[in-house]
């Protein structure tokens, strides 16, 4: 099974990015082999629609679930429509988030966890 994790860097030891649409990287991880495919997120610089753009990119990777800190409404609905399960509340490193997911500690969400434009308001300085 492949999962997609929002990240501030290209490795499993990078911190989870709390923003979905404007995450610096999306790491696509094969849970069986722990092989990592880091993808620089083009949504970081989007003037608008970053959540939907990132959701479409993630859906195209074949991932079945997303681990992130937060997800806004447009991204959530785009991910759900593509059949991906969304898990919010991920913290620590990507590796730690995957371990928490594997232990069942990151529950699937059934709604957005933040309002529109959260990622813009939370942009790193």
Where are these regions (language model features)?
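Non-catalytic interface/targeting segments
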Residues: 1-53, 60-61, 80-125
């Amino acid at each position: 099974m492949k999962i997609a994790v929002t990240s501030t860097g290209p490795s499993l030891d990078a911190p989870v990015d709390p923003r979905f649409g404007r995450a610096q990287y999306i790491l696509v991880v094969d849970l069986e082999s722990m092989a990592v495919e880091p993808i620089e997120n083009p949504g970081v610089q989007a003037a608008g629609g970053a959540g939907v753009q990132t959701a479409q990119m993630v859906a195209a990777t074949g991932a079945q679930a997303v681990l992130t800190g937060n997800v806004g409404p447009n991204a959530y609905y785009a991910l759900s429509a593509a059949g991906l399960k969304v898990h919010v509340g991920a913290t620590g490193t990507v590796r730690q988030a995957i371990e928490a997911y594997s232990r069942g500690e990151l529950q699937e969400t059934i709604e957005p966890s933040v309002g529109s434009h959260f990622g813009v308001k939370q942009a790193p300085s």
